[in-house]
Structures are given as structure tokens and as C-alpha cells.
């Protein structure tokens, strides 16, 4: 169209909510104009009377660099020649009330180290990625049929230097990656890395959505960390907060003197619980900002997945006496997921949703929200409630370990033992377990066993792998000294071996989302607090038999029904002495005997360990009979 510039087209798409690479248009970009190198700045501030750029290059005097209002809807631009990377800057907003506000760039690629708040000019291009093999392998199989075991990591408190300083992204790559690889995790989930002013918000109160926090280094350092993860066959998931943002003066809040990124009306805008502001998802420009942000992390940082935080906060209007669905947010979520999967069909879009909203992990064309995974908060709450009860009381709570299978296939689930469950006096997983010292560890191993054998992908927060006794202390490193204690060291060995068993056992992940992949053997043995079930593989004769005993009693010659007339080998027993148990194991192969039991045509007799789990693999034999 004659007279319409590329800039005009991008502005039009931005206002329609369809500029999905808005980070290439807005922000600070190194470029050349009229033969001179410099940076082009662009910002959306429709309510401002004037916008200037103040920074180290002009003595923080914005009057020297007044931006031009290029578009009627409030997009301001300016090219400043002669400046390079590493310059500090802010937008100097002259509001309609003639107030002056200094604001960080919403699209800044880099920021000053807190408590300082300026944006930093930075050239993202130039990092040489070495993860082509990972990217190719990722496309070869649907995520649903892959093992997914996630190590949830808070970079600032995994380990700290002797003087209390943080390790950098690059430094952590030398320790975290081998550790995660050794233990058999398939993914690392990083708690939010977007820039945030307050350490103890853990990153959930963001000011810089396009800026990885400078606490741990520069953007290229984070790229290096992710690249190294990929080269060691570890995927990287990032916590992503799209519902609300930090209200600090330099951030998005009242950006140009008026509500811009947030809702206009106070009862919609204010998130009283967290002290933040809710994004106005009715604004198309906010759609462009957030969807572009998701695609930015995929394109520029090769992120493999998002755990989308606080989806319930998106789905329902805040501050209402009764739950009221937010149609703007539903449309936003559906569009977000459609655009992400158009970019990468094998991406992980994980909803952290505590509600019973239907079809969360169903495609948008079926009326679903379009995620491909959802945290199973119901399972987590039920199982932890059950495990915190004394063994004597568990027979009265038996439904808590069985109810999850009533809905396990209604969505695609991840089973989460996350940071939320081991903080704010909730106690660590180990400390939640009742009983004496030995019993706590036995029940920890039993909990991990049930977690690993139950349908659903897995997530475990750091420190859970070695049964840290204290809950998470976000200003300190993990209690690594516990590895000097025998029971903690053995707990870590058990978790590691359970994770590796999961990773190498197709039975435990290929049929995760198919009802034919699971069958109860005996779900009704409340009196003894024992559950037994089968995990089936895709191939004929593939099966694991799992028996979990939630009391301290030992049962010898305990018989359960099995589907195949073959031998069964114990592949994991949480009571093995090498894990700190009492060694009530089944060292010999168990031969199936003909005779109906639990609705199965054959049965095996075993020793059931106290406060423990035993897992048996059916030996595939040519001509083995199935009932």
C-alpha cells in the first residue's frame, strides 16, 4: 500500500494484538542510520505528553534526547548515534499531570543489578548455539510418549559461594548440569529468571519481562547455560508469570502516568494477595507484549517449556464475591498456546492451575485452553494429606491414594512436589512424614516410589532428592552437608535409582495418558493400607506390578493377581538395605501360579516391605499367556 511504511504496519499489528515479534520493534536496538552506528529506541506510551531518553550517554539529562511521537496511538521513537553496548538508560515520562517519571524499558534485553533499576543497551545477536542435535532429537517423538522428570531449581539458593554471593549462569553450568544428569532428571525447571527487584519474590514479581535477571550474569551467559543443558540432553523449562506484575515505580505500573499494562479500574487491577497489578488482558497491545515475550524466550533462548504461573488468577476476575470467568483471559490463553505451538509443536506449555476448570490440556479447536500439561494439584494435596496421617489412621483415608485415578485421564498431568509445598512452615517432604527417624526415611522412599509409579510426568523441587530435613530456606543454599549422613546419602541414592528406572522403563511414560496403561489389582485393601496396581506398556507382555504398603507391618507370602503366566523380577524395593531399609526384599524370581485372584487369571506370592514399595517387571517370554 502506497505511503504505508513497515513501521506503520508493525504499529497496526501491535494495536490489533498480532505483533508477535514486538521485541524486534520496541526497545533498544543497535542499528545504523545515515551511515552512523547507534541505538534506535521505541516505546509505547499513549498517555504521555512527552517522552525523553535519559542515560549515562547524556548525563541523565533527558532534554538532550526527546523522542518523536511517530504514531497517533502513542508509539515514540528516537535514534541516538554514537552509543554502544553497556549504556544505562531509562525513559523519562512527562505525564498528563506534568509529573516526571523515570521508567525502565519494558522491552529491555538487560538490566542493572538490583537494587539499581536502569535498563542496559545490549546486543543479543552473536551467541553461537551448539544444540542442533538436541533440537533435532526433540522433534522425533511426541512429548506425551517421552519420560519427563523435572528438577525444579531456584538458582539463587541451590548453592552459594563462601562469601554468600550467587554463582553465575556459567559457573552453575559446571555443577548443576552434571548433578541433574547423574540423578536421571530429564529437565530443569528454572524459577522465574525475568528481572525482578526483590530477591524474596523468587522472581514472581517481574519488572523486566525481556531481561534475564542480571543477578547471575548477562544474557549470553544464560544462553550458554541453556545450550550446555541441551548438549547434555537436559531440557529447560522456565516459570513464566503472565497474570500480574510488580508495582515498583520503575516498572510497568502506571507506565506513562496512567494505567497502561494494567486494568483501569482498581477492583480489576489490584492483586491484593500478592501486592501486584493484574495485566489488562482486554487490551490487544498487552496481548502483543505477552505473546511476543513467550515467543522471544523460545526464539532467542531456546527454552523448551513454560510453567505458566497462577493460571487461576488469569481465568477468573479478581476481587469478586463469586468466581466469574474472565473472557479476555481465556481468549489470551488460547491465542498464546496456538502461537507457541505454531512456533514449536514439541514445546511444553504447563498450567499451574488449582481449579477444576475443564479441558485445560485439550486443543483450542475442541474448546480447550490449549495447554499440553497441567499440574495435578489434587493428587499432590491428597497424597501429602494421606502421608502426613499416622499409619494407624490411613485406613480411614484410603480414598486419598486412589481417588486420583478417577480423573487421571481427563487431562495430561504432571505430578508436582514443588517449592510451594516445602516453604512457609509447611515442612520438607521428609519432615512431613510421621514416626521416628527410620520411619520418616522409609515413608519418604515410599512416597517417592508412589510418585514415580503413578501415571503422570514428574516434578521434584531441589533438595527433595536427598530428603532435606529442613524446609526450603530461600536465602541460604541447600543443606549439602546432609550427604555426610548415611540416611540422607541413601535417600539420594534411592531417588536417583528410581529416576533412572523411570527413565529407562517405557512402561512408565509411553502410556501415561491412555487408560489402558493402568489397572488396579487391589484398590480396596483399606484395612491393611496396601494398594497394588499394574502399569502396562504398549507392547504385548509389557507390565510392571507395583505394591505399596503404607503401614509398618511386614507381609510374607502376600499374594496379588497378575495378568501374565510368566516370571516376575523385583526391579525396585524401597526397603532394600542399600537405601537404609530393613531389607524385606524379593531376591528371587516370582513364578505366576494359575488361579483367579483380584480378577486376574494368575497370581504371585511376595514379601511386602514395611512402609515400603516393591516393583516387579513381568519377564517377556515367547508364548506367555495373558488372561
Curated annotation (Swiss-Prot):
It catalyses: Transfers a segment of a (1->4)-alpha-D-glucan chain to a primary hydroxy group in a similar glucan chain. It is an enzyme of class 2 (transferase). Pfam families: Alpha-amylase, Alpha-amylase_C, CBM_48. GO terms for biological process: glycogen biosynthetic process. The active site is at 309 (nucleophile), 352 (proton donor). It comes from the Bacteria. GO terms for molecular function: 1,4-alpha-glucan branching enzyme activity; cation binding; hydrolase activity, hydrolyzing O-glycosyl compounds. One of its GO terms (cellular component) is cytosol. Its EC number is 2.4.1.18. InterPro entries: A-amylase/branching_C, Branching_enzy, GlgB, GlgB_N_E_set_prok, Glyco_hydro_13_cat_dom, Glyco_hydro_13_N, Glyco_hydro_b, Glycoside_hydrolase_SF. Pathway: Glycan biosynthesis; glycogen biosynthesis. Keywords: Carbohydrate metabolism, Glycogen biosynthesis, Glycogen metabolism, Glycosyltransferase, Transferase. Monomer. NCBIfam families: branching_enzym, PRK05402.1, PRK12313.1. Catalyzes the formation of the alpha-1,6-glucosidic linkages in glycogen by scission of a 1,4-alpha-linked oligosaccharide from growing alpha-1,4-glucan chains and the subsequent attachment of the oligosaccharide to the alpha-1,6 position. Belongs to the glycosyl hydrolase 13 family. GlgB subfamily. This is 1,4-alpha-glucan branching enzyme GlgB. It comes from Bacillus licheniformis (strain ATCC 14580 / DSM 13 / JCM 2505 / CCUG 7422 / NBRC 12200 / NCIMB 9375 / NCTC 10341 / NRRL NRS-1264 / Gibson 46). The gene is glgB.
Amino acid at each position: 500500500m502506497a505511503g504505508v511504511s513497515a513501521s506503520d504496519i508493525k504499529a497496526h499489528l501491535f494495536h490489533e494484538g498480532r505483533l508477535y515479534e514486538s521485541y524486534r520493534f520496541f526497545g533498544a536496538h543497535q542499528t545504523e542510520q545515515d551511515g552512523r552506528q547507534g541505538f534506535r529506541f521505541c516505546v509505547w506510551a499513549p498517555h504521555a505528553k512527552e517522552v525523553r531518553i535519559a542515560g549515562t550517554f547524556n548525563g541523565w539529562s533527558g532534554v538532550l534526547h526527546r523522542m518523536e511521537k511517530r504514531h497517533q496511538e502513542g508509539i515514540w521513537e528516537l535514534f541516538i548515534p554514537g552509543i554502544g553496548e553497556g549504556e544505562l538508560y531509562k525513559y523519562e515520562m512527562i505525564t498528563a499531570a506534568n509529573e516526571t517519571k523515570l521508567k525502565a524499558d519494558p522491552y529491555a534485553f538487560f538490566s542493572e543489578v538490583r537494587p539499581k533499576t536502569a535498563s542496559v543497551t545490549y546486543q543479543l545477536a552473536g551467541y553461537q548455539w551448539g544444540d542442533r542435535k538436541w533440537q533435532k532429537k526433540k522433534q522425533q517423538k511426541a512429548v506425551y510418549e517421552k519420560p519427563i522428570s523435572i528438577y525444579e531449581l531456584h538458582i539463587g539458593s541451590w548453592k552459594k559461594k563462601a562469601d554468600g554471593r550467587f554463582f553465575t549462569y556459567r559457573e552453575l553450568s559446571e555443577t548443576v548440569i552434571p548433578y541433574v544428569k547423574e540423578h536421571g532428571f530429564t529437565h530443569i525447571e528454572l524459577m522465574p529468571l525475568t528481572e525482578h527487584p526483590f530477591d524474596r519474590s523468587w522472581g514472581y514479581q517481574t519488572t523486566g519481562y525481556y531481561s534475564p535477571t542480571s543477578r547471575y550474569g548477562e544474557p549470553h551467559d544464560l544462553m550458554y547455560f541453556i545450550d550446555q543443558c541441551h548438549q547434555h540432553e537436559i531440557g529447560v523449562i522456565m516459570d513464566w508469570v503472565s497474570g500480574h506484575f510488580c508495582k515498583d515505580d520503575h516498572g510497568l505500573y502506571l507506565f506513562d502516568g496512567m494505567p497502561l499494562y494494567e486494568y483501569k479500574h482498581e477492583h480489576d487491577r489490584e492483586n491484593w494477595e500478592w501486592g501486584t497489578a493484574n495485566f489488562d488482558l482486554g487490551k490487544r497491545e498487552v496481548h502483543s507484549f505477552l505473546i511476543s515475550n513467550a515467543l522471544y524466550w523460545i526464539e532467542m533462548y531456546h527454552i523448551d517449556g513454560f510453567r505458566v504461573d497462577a493460571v487461576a488468577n488469569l481465568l477468573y476476575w479478581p476481587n469478586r464475591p463469586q468466581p466469574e470467568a474472565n473472557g479476555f483471559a481465556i481468549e489470551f490463553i488460547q491465542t498464546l498456546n496456538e502461537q507457541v505451538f505454531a512456533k514449536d509443536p514439541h514445546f511444553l506449555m504447563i498450567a499451574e492451575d488449582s481449579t477444576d476448570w475443564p479441558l485445560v490440556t485439550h486443543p483450542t479447536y475442541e474448546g480447550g485452553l490449549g495447554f499440553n500439561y497441567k499440574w495435578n494439584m489434587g493428587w499432590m494435596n491428597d497424597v501429602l494429606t494421606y502421608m502426613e496421617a499416622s499409619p494407624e489412621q490411613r485406613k480411614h483415608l484410603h480414598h486419598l491414594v486412589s481417588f486420583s485415578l478417577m480423573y487421571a485421564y481427563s487431562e495430561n498431568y504432571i505430578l508436582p512436589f514443588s517449592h510451594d509445598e516445602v516453604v512457609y512452615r509447611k515442612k520438607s517432604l521428609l519432615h512431613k512424614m510421621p514416626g521416628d527417624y527410620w520411619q520418616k526415611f522409609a515413608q519418604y522412599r515410599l512416597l517417592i516410589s508412589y510418585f514415580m509409579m503413578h501415571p503422570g510426568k514428574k516434578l521434584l523441587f531441589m533438595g527433595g532428592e536427598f530428603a532435606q530435613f529442613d524446609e526450603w530456606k530461600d536465602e541460604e543454599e541447600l543443606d549439602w552437608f546432609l550427604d555426610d549422613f548415611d540416611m540422607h546419602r541413601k535417600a539420594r541414592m534411592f531417588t536417583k535409582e528410581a529416576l533412572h528406572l523411570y527413565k529407562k522403563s517405557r512402561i512408565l511414560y509411553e502410556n501415561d495418558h491412555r487408560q489402558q496403561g493402568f489397572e488396579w489389582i487391589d484398590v480396596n485393601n483399606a484395612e491393611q493400607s496396601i494398594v497394588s496396581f499394574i502399569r502396562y506398556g504398549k507392547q504385548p507382555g509389557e507390565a510392571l506390578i507395583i505394591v505399596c504398603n503404607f503401614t509398618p507391618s511386614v507381609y510374607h507370602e502376600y499374594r496379588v493377581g497378575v495378568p501374565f503366566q510368566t516370571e516376575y523380577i523385583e526391579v525396585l524395593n524401597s526397603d532394600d538395605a542399600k537405601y537404609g531399609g530393613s531389607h524385606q526384599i524379593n531376591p528371587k524370581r516370582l513364578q505366576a501360579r494359575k488361579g483367579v485372584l483380584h480378577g486376574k487369571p494368575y497370581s504371585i506370592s511376595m514379601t511386602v516391605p514395611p512402609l515400603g514399595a516393591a516393583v516387579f517387571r513381568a519377564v517377556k517370554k515367547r508364548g506367555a499367556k495373558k488372561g
